[in-house]
């Protein structure tokens, strides 16, 4: 199935049902009181993470999604049926962004996690709600409110502990093949990897971590060169980044310039991503003599002013890859657990105080219509004449 990591959809929650104005009509009860029921709440729209999905391709073709409208209230104090909620299944790791305001609504990072993205409209109130000692035959009701309407941009970001960075043909796919059972395509031309790949690494029995390989970056990627930086978002949830550097490029380019270009593109795209722990991994060590190799590595580290971890491997021959995997596992274990955010608790909607405001408004309007000079005991009873 085609890998699609971004889609724009429009979600519309159901409108609330309106309240009803109704009075009891029974034999031997000539002046029945109000019995208009409330409407039903409109259905809301939720996103739910599903570990069985791995692409957003469905939402490229199904862009409009509507929840059910609440039913109107009816006589005899019958409340309208609430609209059914709409639950949209998305892959684990999906982020929801409001396409109009660019506000991030939340991330779905665990299987079964739900997030409210469009709240259904509130139900309207029937005239039974407005009866009082001075208003025995109310003819007021409130309408149901409109449901939330949003344009959402869904962004799928892979969940991985370790992310791979590097120029095309630096050996990223070969490395992930050497430490896991993932089998991404490997060839002797640039941009062999066109979509992100995941692999599970098991350095010790019962202990593992996930590693992500993304297409190679080139200078100018932040401005759209090559495949651009559209796949860098998949590294945002990684705990540590491995900068894979080809020590002996086939085109004769300078490894230092390549490394600086990658760091520059990273900082342009996201300072937060550039600030993550980053290890330098010198690859293709088997292409040079040991004496020349160490001399060149020292020169690269010095020119880059690199003060972090440095590892030398040959992904093709699997030299040094097992030791690097163990180091990564131990480092990840020392990192603090990531905090989980309750995305639903932070969402605010504009209709939260609708009913309270509606009641206050009706009561104020009714009180203003009362005239103290004309007020007498007969005003406590209201005669209602029904005509068929």
From Swiss-Prot:
Residues 362-377 have a biased composition (Acidic residues). It comes from Shewanella piezotolerans (strain WP3 / JCM 13877). This is GTPase Obg. Residues 1-159 form the Obg domain. Pfam families: GTP1_OBG, MMR_HSR1. Mg(2+) binds at residues 173, 193. Its main location: cytoplasm. Keywords: Cytoplasm, GTP-binding, Hydrolase, Magnesium, Metal-binding, Nucleotide-binding. It is found in: Cytoplasm. Monomer. PROSITE patterns: G_OBG, GTP1_OBG, OBG. The keyword Nucleotide-binding applies.
């Amino acid at each position: 199935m085609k890998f699609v990591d971004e889609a724009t959809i429009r979600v519309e929650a159901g409108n609330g049902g309106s309240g009803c104005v109704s009075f009891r009509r029974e034999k031997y009860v000539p002046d029945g009181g109000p019995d208009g029921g409330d409407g039903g709440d409109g259905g809301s729209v939720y996103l739910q993470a599903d570990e069985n999905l791995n692409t957003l391709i469905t939402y490229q073709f199904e862009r409009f999604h509507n929840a059910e409208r609440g039913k109107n209230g009816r006589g005899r104090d019958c409340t309208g049926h609430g609209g059914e909620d709409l639950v949209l299944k998305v892959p684990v790791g999906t982020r929801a962004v409001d396409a109009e305001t660019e506000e991030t609504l939340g991330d779905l990072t665990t299987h079964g996690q739900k997030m409210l993205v469009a709240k259904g409209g509130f139900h309207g109130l029937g005239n039974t709600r407005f009866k009082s000692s001075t208003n025995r035959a109310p003819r007021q009701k409130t309408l149901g409110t409109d449901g939330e309407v949003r344009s959402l941009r869904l962004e799928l970001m892979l969940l991985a502990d370790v992310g791979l960075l590097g120029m095309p043909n630096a050996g990223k796919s070969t490395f992930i093949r050497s430490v896991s059972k993932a089998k991404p395509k490997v060839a002797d031309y640039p941009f062999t990897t066109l979509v992100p790949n995941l692999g599970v690494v098991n350095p010790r029995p019962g202990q593992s971590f996930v590693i992500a390989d993304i297409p190679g970056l080139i200078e100018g990627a932040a401005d759209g060169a090559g495949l651009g930086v559209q796949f860098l978002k998949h590294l945002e949830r990684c705990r540590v980044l491995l900068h894979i550097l080809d020590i002996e490029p086939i085109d004769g380019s300078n490894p230092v310039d390549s490394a600086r270009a990658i760091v520059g593109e990273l900082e342009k795209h996201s300072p937060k991503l550039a600030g993550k722990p980053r290890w330098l991994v010198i690859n293709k060590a088997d292409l040079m003599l040991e004496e020349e190799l160490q001399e060149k590595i020292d020169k690269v580290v010095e020119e880059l002013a690199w003060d972090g971890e440095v590892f030398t491997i040959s992904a093709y021959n699997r030299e040094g890859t097992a030791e690097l995997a163990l180091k990564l596992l131990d480092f990840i274990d020392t990192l603090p657990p990531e905090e989980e955010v309750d995305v639903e608790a932070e969402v605010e909607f504009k209709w939260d105080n609708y009913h309270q405001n509606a009641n206050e408004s009706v009561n104020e309007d009714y009180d203003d219509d009362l005239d103290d000079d004309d007020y007498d005991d007969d005003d406590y009873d209201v005669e209602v004449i029904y005509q068929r």
